[in-house]
């Protein structure tokens, strides 16, 4: 894909003009629904799981990094190392309205052991990916404390295969976590 095409695609996938967690949630649900026909086998089509190289898809998974890092990764076609063994993703949506950015940052730092999450701006930006069969679910989970003191648990996924296709990036943009 030519550099101009990549640049156009990157900006086309950016979530803009979203001001609340509810708006971002609706936007991401629509984006996920748009992707379903592209990643699910159609009627009368069989899907050989072994041939596809892994288990069935996990829906949208999120990577939390800063915007410049995401741009570099997108143009390079690879995920950043944000974990000792590759890329760490989660099913924590970027519109979780009852958890603060600081708490998300703490959870990511604890789960990944990545010193880069010491700065909250490292997790203020998200990239939503659809990796059918390309990630593994880890045995550990990320535990966060909500703004009301409730324990929230999110799954963690790993990808040691850091190359990705532009079509696997579904959306990216600023997170809409609780302010606090």
UniProtKB/Swiss-Prot annotation:
Superkingdom per UniProt: Bacteria
Top-tier EC class: hydrolase
Keyword Hydrolase in annotation: yes
Keywords: Cytokinin biosynthesis, Glycosidase, Hydrolase, Plasmid
Enzyme Commission number(s) from the entry: 3.2.1.-
GO molecular-function term, one example from the UniProt record: beta-glucosidase activity
Listed GO biological process terms: carbohydrate metabolic process; cytokinin biosynthetic process
The keyword Hydrolase is assigned to this record: yes
Function noted in UniProt: Hydrolyzes cytokinin glucosides thus liberating free cytokinins. Contributes to the root inducing activity.
Protein name stated in the entry: Cytokinin-beta-glucosidase
Organism of derivation: Rhizobium rhizogenes
Annotated gene: rolC
